[in-house]
Amino acid sequence: MSTQDSAKITTVEHRRNIYLVGLMGAGKTTVGRQLARRLSRPFFDTDHEIVERTGVPIPTIFEIEGEEGFRRREAQTIYDLTAENNIVLATGGGVVINPENRRRLHDTGWVVYLNVSPVLLYERTRHDRNRPLLRVEDPLAKLEELHSIRDPLYREVAHIVVDGSHLVASGIVQYLLREFNRL
């Protein structure tokens, strides 16, 4: 990408942020890092930020504070990071549960929904022990349930929806760069 293209994306829409939403394992962090690098923007990941702020892993937060405590921390992190300019942010999969998070994301940046089938998400996450919501007897059923609940919320907040089931991260980044230049 040329410097001119990067400058165009940077200045359009008054220096809007780019937020990636989707279920765990959708590729938000991988795509976000590559996109930030291509646009010369800082990259943040809400889960990483929460771990940095608390000094403990996400599963520990879930064990001590429950999902409700984690969601409060996530909402504060979203509030803080959406005040930044020109960042790329990979959000946690449940960020859209909170209506205020959805409003802040939609109003302060371009929201990209990486939609991936629950079966593929299961393949990507089945060996990952840092996913508290998947510590259940049937993780695939849990992913299907989460997808059915959250998909409408992701679509509500998204400016761009990408089917991430059939594209590698670099292909998604190329697609997004073209889309941002059309906005």
Curated annotation (Swiss-Prot):
Gene Ontology CC terms: cytosol
Alphabetically ordered keywords of this record: Amino-acid biosynthesis, Aromatic amino acid biosynthesis, ATP-binding, Cytoplasm, Kinase, Magnesium, Metal-binding, Nucleotide-binding, Transferase
Main location: cytoplasm
Subcellular compartments: Cytoplasm
Cofactor: Mg(2+)
Residues that hold ATP according to the record: 25-30, 131
Catalytic activity: shikimate + ATP = 3-phosphoshikimate + ADP + H(+)
Pathway: Metabolic intermediate biosynthesis; chorismate biosynthesis; chorismate from D-erythrose 4-phosphate and phosphoenolpyruvate: step 5/7
CDD domains hit by this protein: SK
Binding annotation for substrate: 47, 71, 93, 150
EC supergroup of this enzyme: transferase
Organism superkingdom: Bacteria
Binding-site positions, Mg(2+): 29
GO biological process, one term: amino acid biosynthetic process
Matches recorded under PROSITE patterns: SHIKIMATE_KINASE (PS01128)
GO molecular function: ATP binding; magnesium ion binding; shikimate kinase activity
E.C. designation(s): 2.7.1.71
Cofactor binding: number and manner: Binds 1 Mg(2+) ion per subunit.
Family under the similarity heading: Belongs to the shikimate kinase family.
PANTHER family associated with the record: SHIKIMATE KINASE, SHIKIMATE KINASE 1, CHLOROPLASTIC
Subunit organization: Monomer.
Function: Catalyzes the specific phosphorylation of the 3-hydroxyl group of shikimic acid using ATP as a cosubstrate.
Protein name: Shikimate kinase
Native source organism of the sequence: Dechloromonas aromatica (strain RCB)
Gene, per the UniProt record: aroK
